[in-house]
Structure formats: structure tokens, C-alpha cells
Amino acid sequence: MKKSLILVGTQWGDEGKGKIVDFYSKKFDAVCRFQGGHNAGHTIYKEEEKFVLHLIPSGIFYDHVSCFIGQGVILSIDSLLEEIEQLEQKGINLEGKLRISRYCSLLLPLHAKIDQLRDCLLYT
């Protein structure tokens, strides 16, 4: 029988989830992020190099681990592309290891502009 480990944070903040997932991810075949957005990030050190992940699951550092971004994630395309570029520049291979649900809600630059305009109208 295959075993699963589910880590759920209930404090809406820095609870150390990223460090726990990183610790266990090398023992699993898959690491899934099921909800949330491009958060403040969790810091991971691999071979004394610092990585800060916001969207991509920390299992990405292990060749045998498939990483999934699920449909409950609010996906910032700009943040995702920036994170992928930073990982690739540091020699992390993502090819064939990262899967993204086609049902993710997209957070586009237009949404940030709308929020800025709304704030200007409400608070000026």
C-alpha cells in the first residue's frame, strides 16, 4: 500500500510548512500544491545555495519527484515565469517534473492594475 502525507497549515502565515515539505519531499514521488497564491515564499538551502520558492513545490529539487500545481492555486504568470527562470539559472532542471492544472485561476498584470485603480478611487 502506498502512503501519503498531507501537510495543512491553519495559521495563514509562516508556520514552517516549506521546510517540512522540503524535508519529506525526497521520500515521495510527488509533491502537490493545492491552493493559495504566490506567497511570501519559503527559503530552502540546497548545497549551501539559497532558494526562495513562492509557487513551485519544493520537491522540484529531486529528480524522482513530480511537482503539481493544483486547480486551487491562483497562478501569477509573471511570478511563475520569474521563479522558473531563477531555478534554471541555478541549474535546477524542471523539464518533465512540473505539472500545472489547466483549471488554475490566473492572476494577470491587469488584475494588479484594477486593484491599484480601485484603491485610488476608494482612498483618495
Residue ranges of predicted features:
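Catalytic core of tubulin tyrosine ligase-like
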Residues: 120
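Glycine-rich, N-terminal phosphate-binding loop and its surrounding beta-alpha-beta segment
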Residues: 41-116
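Conserved small/polar residues in nucleotide/adenosyl-binding loops
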Residues: 123-124
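N-terminal basic/disordered segments at the start of proteins
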Residues: 8-46, 59
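Extreme N-terminal starter segment of soluble prokaryotic enzymes
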Residues: 2-5
